[in-house]
């Protein structure tokens, strides 16, 4: 969150972020596996909630993180589909926002936020693509992450 505040983006919709922390999560998922990525994600969410946020912020973060990690892990392990880390990250960005949307729908009702869904979907698509591109660069240029899986 602190790092993200150094790069303010003029995004006109509340709650839409680039999700730079997801770069680390995706790299950990590929390097160390699901359990480690889940641990990092939960610890990040807790630290963020205690430092900058609230219980509701943690619920949004947890729902998005867990759902996206489960789906990304499933796609990563489906080797017969030949989905790259870029594709996995794009789907992760979208499913992260779907998880957060589900929490918001549960809290305020789906009809109140349904018009917001297309913006969340496309922001997840774009953010997931940008993070996916960074993941590919990191896996190519940083020896620690250059494994073939």
Enumerate the predicted regions with their spans:
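Aromatic-anchored segments of alpha-helical transmembrane domains
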Residues: 1-4, 43-53, 93-99
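Hydrophobic transmembrane alpha-helices
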Residues: 1-28
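Short, motif-level signal for alpha-helix interfacial/capping segments enriched in acidic residues
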Residues: 10-13, 73-80
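Hydrophobic transmembrane-helix microenvironments that flank and shape a buried ionizable site
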Residues: 19, 41, 45, 61, ...
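Generic transmembrane alpha-helix motif of multi-pass integral membrane proteins
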Residues: 20-34, 71-76
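Helix-adjacent hinge/juxtasegments
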Residues: 35-77
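Membrane-embedded alpha-helical hairpins and interfacial helices in multi-pass inner-membrane proteins
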Residues: 54, 58-59, 78-149
